[in-house]
């Protein structure tokens, strides 16, 4: 059990009924689903880098396809539920897997706190999770930590003249990320 004294929820009710278009996006976000045949995904050793670290690539166990999404973009008009589906994906991934380091990002922290962050907190409440029991929020650090040590981290993606290469992110390692309103930020910030 995690040392943070939080507890796994019991008897939670997850109410998620995506529209057909939302469901298409949701299917692509599943880490163990091949969009071609529906089979399970495995990580296959493809070689080693210069420091002799193993390099893996996802591959379908059944059809052997390596043409699997690594970057998924959802588009459409306002009100289509893209932010909601992305928020459900972050929360459900953190609940499903321990030690996930998930990022939710937007151009400014202010706009993130006023929108997507509220959506994430609403999902947690709607699913019956309790703050300081199943998860805790650190508003100063901009983190939401689950009982299993998975964490959602808020990040600002604005271009800052004093940091044109986004060195403020350093060697940060994240498992998954969702950038809301990606059209508002530069391509370099996404890289």
Q: Which functions belong to the PLM regions below?
A:
Residues 1-191:
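Short, flexible loop motifs at catalytic/binding sites
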């Amino acid at each position: 059990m995690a040392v943070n004294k939080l507890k796994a929820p019991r008897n939670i009710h997850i109410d998620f009924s995506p529209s057909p278009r939302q469901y298409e996006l949701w299917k692509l976000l599943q880490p163990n689903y091949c969009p071609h045949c529906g089979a399970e995904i495995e990580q296959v050793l493809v070689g080693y880098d210069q420091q002799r670290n193993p390099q893996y690539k996802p591959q379908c166990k059944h059809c052997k396809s390596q043409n699997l999404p690594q970057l998924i973009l959802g588009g459409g008009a306002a009100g289509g539920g893209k932010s909601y589906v992305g928020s459900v994906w972050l929360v459900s991934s953190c609940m499903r897997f321990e030690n996930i380091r998930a990022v939710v990002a937007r151009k400014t922290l202010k706009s993130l706190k006023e929108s997507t962050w509220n959506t994430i907190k609403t999902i947690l409440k709607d699913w019956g999770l309790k703050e300081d029991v199943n998860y805790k929020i650190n508003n100063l650090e901009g983190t939401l930590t689950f009982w299993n040590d998975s964490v959602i981290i808020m990040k600002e993606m604005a271009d800052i003249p004093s940091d044109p290469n986004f060195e403020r992110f350093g060697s940060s390692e994240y498992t998954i990320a969702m950038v809301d309103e990606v059209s508002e930020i530069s391509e370099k910030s996404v890289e």
